[in-house]
């Protein structure tokens, strides 16, 4: 009988702890809104989603960028130089349920790609009451990318962002950056 009571008490405590953890995760629902062309940002997002359980939403330009590097960079530079906000494909369902939004982007021409700016500034999404966390992948430096994401969401609160610097493309060797990413997530309590 004593063993039964100990077992029942232990089971109850485990179930209570699981329920509290589940409640905590549901209280602060997280979305990762991301854009990727070469695959680096996508690889980072996949890792973060796996570690945190966050939902993901891919920001896509309605008219896809060229698959070849040089023509893609020409299109992207023209958009930045002319402050063009290209049309994007859709918006996240139930955006209002998310308290935290990680905005993950590559650095293009010293800032976030213009489809991301469309998502942040021209989509009609309500950023008030949200916490936005900027993240970028870059070949050399983040330049103003993290600051530009913050500037584009003035009604949100913001947490410390992260720049993941890598000289590879297609997500190659991005796993070597996972310890840096994991330490950042831990610091943010995600």
Regions inferred by a protein language model and the residue ranges of each:
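Solvent-exposed loop/turn segments at secondary-structure junctions
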Residues: 37-40, 61-65, 107-111, 138-142, ...
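N-terminal beta1-alpha1-beta2 submodule of the flavodoxin-like/Rossmannoid cofactor-binding fold
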Residues: 19-103, 112, 121, 128, ...
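Glycine-rich phosphate/pyrophosphate-binding loop and the adjoining helix
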Residues: 159-190
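Bacterial Sec-dependent N-terminal signal peptides
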Residues: 1-23
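Short alpha-helix in the alpha/beta-hydrolase fold that links the catalytic acid
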Residues: 115-116, 120, 145-149
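A glycine- and small-aliphatic-rich helix-loop capping segment at beta-alpha/alpha-beta transitions
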Residues: 118-125, 153
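Short, glycine-/small-residue-rich phosphate/pyrophosphate-handling segment
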Residues: 133-168
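Short, acidic/small-residue loops that bind anionic groups at enzyme active sites
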Residues: 123-131, 136
